[in-house]
Amino acid sequence: SGVGGELLYLPFKARWALGATINAVRQRDFNKEFGLLDYETVTAFISLFYASAFYNYDLAIHAGRYLAKDKGATIEVRRTFENGFSIGAFATFTNVSAAEYGEGSFDKGLYFQIPFNSFVSRNTKGKVATILRSLQRDGGQKLDDFTGRLWHDLRSVRYDSFEKHKLRMIPK
């Protein structure tokens, strides 16, 4: 449990943006629904985003402090298709040594999101998402969905989306 926030600076008619995220969190107890453990930390990230004109690729670099109090950066590449389906890859490198991290030496993986719009007759913001990792260790772990969420949530109103679909701007 915890509290946090995100800011996004997205200049007009730009394909890039700067973001900042900070979260103060405390670990939940494994056996109690609302119990808390003694572990507390603050995660904080500065992010640089870029929307490529090439096949709807979004690139991101997040640098900051992770849940295990390690410091480093995550590189992320995501492609979003016209129907809302997206697939991406990420790699996180931190100050945790390969010997401390163990097998795999850094956090990496693939992820995808499938919107429910493809399966239901009405418009919905629902989706199913998953992350595929070879191994998951403490190093390089972030809070899920709390870094770069604004950048991806605002995709439909970003300049790169309007530029590609100019007819959306013309009233019928």
Model region roles, listed by residue range:
Residues S1, L18-R26, F30, L48, ...:
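Transmembrane beta-strand segments that form the barrel wall of outer-membrane beta-barrel proteins
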Residues S1, N31-L37, H62-R65, A99-Y101, ...:
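Outer-membrane beta-barrel domain signature
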Residues G2-G4, Y9-K13, Q27-N31, Y50-Y57, D70-G72, F81-N83, A98-G102, F116-R122, ...:
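Outer-membrane beta-barrel proteins
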Residues V3, L36-A44, K69-A73, G104-L110:
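Residues that define the transmembrane beta-barrel architecture of outer-membrane proteins
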Residues G5-Y9, I46-Y50, I75-R79, L110-I114:
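Residues on the lipid-exposed face of transmembrane beta-strands in outer-membrane beta-barrel proteins
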Residues A14-L18, Y55-L59, K71, F81-F85, ...:
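Outer-envelope beta-barrel architecture signal
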Residues L48, S105-K172:
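Outer-membrane beta-barrel "beta-signal"
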